[in-house]
């Protein structure tokens, strides 16, 4: 450790394996100062311009916005975006963005009003009096992300560093050819960059602060040294020009001699790195109170007449910037966003500038050279020699091409920084970086699917466990309810058990009777009498119910009378056809006659108790009386014409007598209840009564004969 610290004091630097030295081509754009670009008419602001999820929209179509006004809310790793100028929100819809595949992402489209009015700005000039948490939250809510190309939220990165950061590294290497955005920013705004570095140091409290810059930027080195002349807490380290010395792991090793482990982060070894442009954005957010709405973009290439570095508002269409730089496209013109090694070709020029856009390269045909056809790998190992991450690009190429994801993961394809050094030196012109990007995307998709499947499985298992717990709790409640009755139920159960035990004791107790005495059966007799009384009461109640139902309906009574008459006729026919030798028991005939008289009296009572409002039609009564007289005449004729040897059936005679008496009484009641205006013929009534008396006398005489 002592040797390591002494090496730091001597400004010792280390060198990493691999790397290349391509033509720099930086002099095209780093010789002119930063300039402003006229406002575009329309701005397209994608909601996601960083690593992580997009924020929540807080504006709607038709809203008036000011420059710096939040368009989304930032929570967690969601970084907000802000309006680049004042104007009106005309649409919120998907739009193609800065992506190798030009994927469409949800964007806010603003029509500028030309006034470019800011929101009220509240700067914290005394930021040292603010807490660490307040500063980190302000940096996050003002939309600051890594401007070196990764786009990781700066606030989240500072929060994750915590108290374990010992070394703060400011990346000023800018190693890729053509790009001079950081170089020009340090030349024109060195004091503001250093102020942003001091804010980061105040938040992290590291033991040392290192600025790493390549030796191909002499003007920027001079400006930084001038600003840091009286500072002893910040060290400026000039390193040799080598690509890709600006990589995070490579620059960390160059300045500290420490290597970031495979699959790890620089914070694991106590190092945190920020870009020069990010430090400048932190200064504007904290001290000036300005959210990030613009950044420095390099416009370069031989197809551009006015190359240089400009302040480009976020959301400005690429076409607008190129036109301002006097873009002269050829027939098959190519425009690259980023550098020639790590950038990607734009499918069209309507994509907007975002936070990670640091360069727009429009090369001529001479700069690009003739397109080379991809050849087969010759296993020369030049790619392995040039790889700064100590990987085996040749093996990764075969694994990627053969869809062998497990082997590619085992060979640490995730550590590939996609610098393009392997593709630069490949004699077979194999686009290795494209294969590696595709392979990493496929592996990420597979892991995402596995994660979703694991989450779904966890949710299913949690649901099953919850259902099992609920079932067990439900069974336990039922069991408790069955075993533990309420207090009143317990008392009732105890009383019932006591009665049962008492009865059992009485049943098992022997009855002792002394000699000459009788057992006391009074209790048994009383119980028997009580049961009989209860049965009689129930029978009487049932009989009253039936009688009430019968009396309440006079129609039913009439129907029953008709049925009785039909049964009587049928009985007469059966007796007439019966054999003469079969004699009828006179006692049975008397019993049946008595039953008939009882039924007749019951019928009279029912008719007398019938509802008064139901009046008997006198016409019907007269008709029935006529029918009765006709039947009587017919019966007399049959008896007169009968053979002397045929004996009269006493049962039939008794029934007919009972029916005749019932009809006579019914006729009398009907006549008594008839309307006064409808008078009955007294002669007919007298005749009917005489006939009834004659029939009754005959029946009585026949009964006497039978008894003799």
Swiss-Prot record:
[4Fe-4S] cluster 2 binds at residues 387, 416, 419, 422. Gene3D superfamilies: 3.30.70.20, NADH-ubiquinone oxidoreductase 51kDa subunit. Residues 369-397, 407-436 form the 4Fe-4S ferredoxin-type domain. It is found in: Cell inner membrane. It comes from the Bacteria. Residues 630-682 are annotated as: Disordered. Its cofactor is [4Fe-4S] cluster. Keywords: 4Fe-4S, Cell inner membrane, Cell membrane, Electron transport, Iron, Iron-sulfur, Membrane, Metal-binding, Repeat, Translocase, Transport. [4Fe-4S] cluster 1 binds at residues 377, 380, 383, 426. GO terms for molecular function: 4 iron, 4 sulfur cluster binding; electron transfer activity; metal ion binding. It holds the Pfam family Fer4_7. The keyword Disulfide bond does not apply. SUPFAM superfamilies: alpha-helical ferredoxin, Nqo1 FMN-binding domain-like. One of its GO terms (cellular component) is plasma membrane. It is a peripheral membrane protein. One of its GO terms (biological process) is electron transport chain. Binds 2 [4Fe-4S] clusters per subunit. Its EC number is 7.-.-.-. NCBIfam families: PRK05035.1, rnfC. Belongs to the 4Fe4S bacterial-type ferredoxin family. RnfC subfamily. The complex is composed of six subunits: RsxA, RsxB, RsxC, RsxD, RsxE and RsxG. HAMAP family: RsxC_RnfC. PANTHER family: ION-TRANSLOCATING OXIDOREDUCTASE COMPLEX SUBUNIT C (PTHR43034:SF2). Part of a membrane-bound complex that couples electron transfer with translocation of ions across the membrane. Required to maintain the reduced state of SoxR. This is Ion-translocating oxidoreductase complex subunit C. The gene is rsxC.
